[in-house]
């Protein structure tokens, strides 16, 4: 493991098949004619790793992959972007999903739940080697990430996770919510955003919780503070075409600021800028904001 690693990203490597549909929700009918349906690598871990890498942070990505066409796409993605990647074999196959994308950029994701193997683990020796000199670890909510916190909690490294559209009740994500120092999630499925954020702080080790809410900005709660703060969204500089990956981009932008020692307000702005940029990139191609573009509006 290089001693010059800023962030280790665990999990979230996979393939999405993108279908642009005339509207969401999609009314029932026998068939629809849509534009080209394209499979492409770039699930949450791929996106976070690419975002950090593009911002100049030295990034290592580790995940389980199948010996299948989807795995080949993921390997090619990392090679194409010069992104260091360690693939561990899994009999379950590479993670995959079908994403329906509406004209306004909103996404409905159909996750293939068959591509998970209970026996999969990140080897302890591998984690030890890759965290020996890392500054930070980002754990995606994909198996076998739920098993790694026992080891990470004993290491002098900060940890983040993104709970995506967690409803605050699903117990399977609590291991992530309660064992990370920085917790990100979407507000879309939460009935009480503030209560969920306080529960994550009270039950776990989080230093702060960020709930993103798209064009409405979002909320942040810091340990030791009683009030939930609001932060503003950033208007995209180009038309919105796809929200896929916006949350991943927010995480990348926020972590860039956090690891640079920037104040919370700056980290939130970096995240908002990166997320807005991601909404202007079609999901059928990979693209992340670079450092110059991120810093230009924030200056």
Curated annotation (Swiss-Prot):
Its EC number is 2.7.1.187. Keywords: Kinase, Transferase. It is an enzyme of class 2 (transferase). InterPro entries: Carboh/pur_kinase_PfkB_CS, PfkB_dom, Ribokinase-like. It comes from the Bacteria. GO terms for molecular function: kinase activity. It catalyses: acarbose + ATP = acarbose 7(IV)-phosphate + ADP + H(+). Catalyzes the phosphorylation of the alpha-glucosidase inhibitor acarbose. Phosphorylation of acarbose could be a resistance-like self-protection mechanism. Belongs to the carbohydrate kinase PfkB family. This is Acarbose 7(IV)-phosphotransferase. The gene is acbK.
